[in-house]
Amino acid sequence: MSKVYELVSEYQPSGDQPTAIKQLLEGLDAGLAHQTLLGVTGSGKTFTLANVIAQAQRPAILLAPNKTLAAQLYGEMKSFFPNNAVEYFVSYYDYYQPEAYVPTTDTFIEKDASVNAHIEQMRLSATKALLERKDAIIVASVSAIYGLGDPESYLQMMLHLRRGDVIDQRDMLRRLAELQYSRNDVAFERGQFRVRGEVIDIFPAESDQDAVRVEMFDDEVDCISVFDPLTGVVKQRDLPRYTIYPKTHYVTPRDRILEAIESIKVELEVRKKQLLENNKLIEEQRISQRTQFDIEMMNELGFCSGIENYSRYLSGRSEGEPPPTLFDYLPHDGLLIIDESHVTVPQIGAMYKGDRSRKETLVEFGFRLPSALDNRPLKFEEFESLAPQTIFVSATPGNYELEKSAGEIADQVVRPTGLLDPILEVRPVATQVDDLLSEIRIRAAKEERVLVTTLTKRMAEDLTEYLHEHDVRVRYLHSDIDTVERVEIIRDLRLGEFDVLVGINLLREGLDMPEVSLVAILDADKEGFLRSERSLIQTIGRAARNIEGKAILYADNITKSMKKAMDETNRRREKQQAYNEKMGITPQALKRNIKDIMELGDITKSKRQRNTKQVPLSKVAEPSQTYEVMSPQQLEKEISRLEAAMYQHAQDLEFELAAEKRDEIEKLRAQFIANS
C-alpha cells in the first residue's frame, strides 16, 4: 500500500520518542480506545505524534485548548507534513456577543459578531480536505464540538461541473446563488462570482489562492480552468471536472427549508398555546412576532438572522439528538489527539452547561422556541460516544485521562537534547522577596531570565513595583492582556528588553522559553488551584528548557501537592540523568530562534510565495540612519508600506512579525515629526 502521509524532518526519533511511538502504534493496532502520552516539556511530543500519524497512515483531528496553541501546533504539523492536507479549524469569530436576555433589568441583548473571513476560509478548507482527501490532518480548538452544517446537506448542495455538461447559464448562476455565492462583476473576492459574456469566474469560498473559470459554448461547458484571481494567470487549463463547495457549512436545500418551515409552524402553535395557558401574554406575542418574521425571511431568502436556532429541523434531527459537528466529517478510521488534555478535557465538559443556561432564559421569556435548545455544543457524553480512538497528550494528565487509559501510558521523559528537569529547592517564606531579589541579580548578570508566580493580583502588582524600585527590569503579565500583547511580552522577555516576568498563573501553555533559567513560586505551600500538584509541575516545567534550569519553591511547610510535584520532578530528573550517562549524552542548550517563539504556521502559503522572501526579524526595515535622510513624503510612503505589511501579518496570525512592524512604524513616525 502506498503511503499517503509523508513525514519530512531532518531529525530521527531519539530519547524516549522511539519507545513512545512504538507503544502508541501497538495500542492503536490493538484497538485501544484511549491512550495517554505523558510527555515532559521539551521532549518533542509533537514530533512523536507526527511519527504516529505517519506510521499509522490515518487521518487525525488534533484538539488544542486555545487558538494560540492550535496555531503553533498547526505550524509544526505543516512543517512535518508539507505535502499533505494540514488544515486549521478554530472559531472564526474575532468578536462574539451571543443573544441573551437579563430578566432582572428586562434587557435583551441582540447577537453581535465579527467574522474573520480568513479563518472562515480555512474552516471550509478543512472540511473539504476531510471529504476529498485521504491525507487530512486537522488542527482544531474546542470549537470543533459546536454545531456545524449537516454533512449530507452540504454534500447535496455541491455544484459538480464537468467538461461537456449541458447546463443553461441562468441555471448555473441560480445554483451558485443557492450556494450563497454573490455576484460581483467589479470587485472579485472569495465567495463571489462574475459573468463576462459566456465566461463565468468563480472564487471558491474555501480557497485563498485559486479561482475557477468556466467557459461556455451556448449551453455547454466548453472549458474549465484554474487561475490566480490576483494576476489572472491561468495555472491549469482544460480540467475534466471541478466541484464548487457551498460558501458556508450551513447551506440547506430548498425542499429541506420548506419542510423545516412547516415543522417550525407546528411548534410555534404548540408553544403559543402553552404560554397563553400560563397567562404569559407578552411572551406569546413576542415568540409569535419573532418566529413569523424568521419564517418570512427563510421563505424569501432561504436564510434568516439566527437561522442556527432552527438547526434541529434544518438538519432533520430529532429532539435531543447531538448536533452535526466536525467529527461527522472525520472518516471512520480517524484518530483524535487531545493536546494539553488536562486543560482541554474539562473545557469540553463545560461548554454545554454554559450555553444551556443562557438559552433556557431566552426560551422561557419568549425570545426563542424550545427547539433552539438543540442548537448547542456536544454534551460530554456525546463527545465520548462520537470520539474515535483517542490519544491524550500532557505533561500532567488529569484523573479522567489516567482512568480512561487504564494504565496504557507512554512515558516520554527523556529529552533528545539531554536537558534535565530543573533542580528544586525549598526556601522559607519569611525572606522570600529579598532572597528572590538576590537570585534575580545573579540571573540578570548572566543575561538569563526569571519567571515569578504569585497567588494574588495584589501581590503580583506590589512585587512588580518593589522590584522596579530596586532597578530590576520587570514586567507584569495579568489577565487583562490579550493574546497579541501576551506574545509581544514573551518576545520582549526573550530579546532581553526586561529580565523578570511576574504573573499569577504562569503555567499557561506556550510560555516555554530557553532563556528562562529560574522559576520562583511564592507561597508554594498554600494549597489550592494554583498550587495543586499539576499546577506546580507545569510551573516548574517553565525552566526545563534551560541547561541551568532551577525552580525555587518558597514555603514553610511541604504540602501533599508539593511533595507529589517534587517527587515526580525528581523521578524524571533521575531517569533523564541515567539515560544520559548510559548513552554518553551531554545536555545541550536550546538555541531557538526568537522569531519562532510564537510562529503560528505558514497559514497563507500562497501569499508568502507571491511576496518577496521572508525578511529576518532583525531587518524588518531599513536601518534608522537611512530614515534620517528621507523626506517627509518618502517617510509617509514607507509608513504606509509597513502598515500594510503589519495588518497582513496580523491577519495571518503572525503576531510576532506584526509587532515588529508596529515598533518600526513608531520609530518612523517620530522621525517623520523630526524631519517635518
UniProtKB/Swiss-Prot annotation:
Domain (Helicase C-terminal) ranges: 432-598
Keyword Metal-binding assigned: no
GO biological process per UniProt: nucleotide-excision repair; SOS response
Superkingdom: Bacteria
Gene Ontology CC terms: cytoplasm; excinuclease repair complex
Domain UVR: 636-671
Sites where the protein binds ATP: 39-46
Keywords carried by this UniProt record: ATP-binding, Cytoplasm, DNA damage, DNA excision, DNA repair, Excision nuclease, Nucleotide-binding, SOS response
One of the record's GO molecular function terms: ATP binding
Protein's cellular compartments: Cytoplasm
Motif mapping: Beta-hairpin: 92-115
InterPro entries: Helicase/UvrB_N, Helicase_ATP-bd, Helicase_C-like, P-loop_NTPase, UVR_dom, UVR_dom_sf, UvrB, UvrB_inter
Transmembrane feature ranges: none
Pfam family, one: Helicase_C
Helicase ATP-binding domain residues: 26-414
SUPFAM superfamilies with a match to the protein in the record: C-terminal UvrC-binding domain of UvrB (SSF46600), P-loop containing nucleoside triphosphate hydrolases (SSF52540)
DNA repair listed as a keyword: yes
Role, per record: The UvrABC repair system catalyzes the recognition and processing of DNA lesions. A damage recognition complex composed of 2 UvrA and 2 UvrB subunits scans DNA for abnormalities. Upon binding of the UvrA(2)B(2) complex to a putative damaged site, the DNA wraps around one UvrB monomer. DNA wrap is dependent on ATP binding by UvrB and probably causes local melting of the DNA helix, facilitating insertion of UvrB beta-hairpin between the DNA strands. Then UvrB probes one DNA strand for the presence of a lesion.
Family listed: Belongs to the UvrB family.
Complex and partners: Forms a heterotetramer with UvrA during the search for lesions. Interacts with UvrC in an incision complex.
Record note on domains: The beta-hairpin motif is involved in DNA binding.
The protein, known as: UvrABC system protein B
Species of provenance: Vibrio parahaemolyticus serotype O3:K6 (strain RIMD 2210633)
Higher taxonomy: Bacteria, Pseudomonadati, Pseudomonadota, Gammaproteobacteria, Vibrionales
Gene coding for it: uvrB
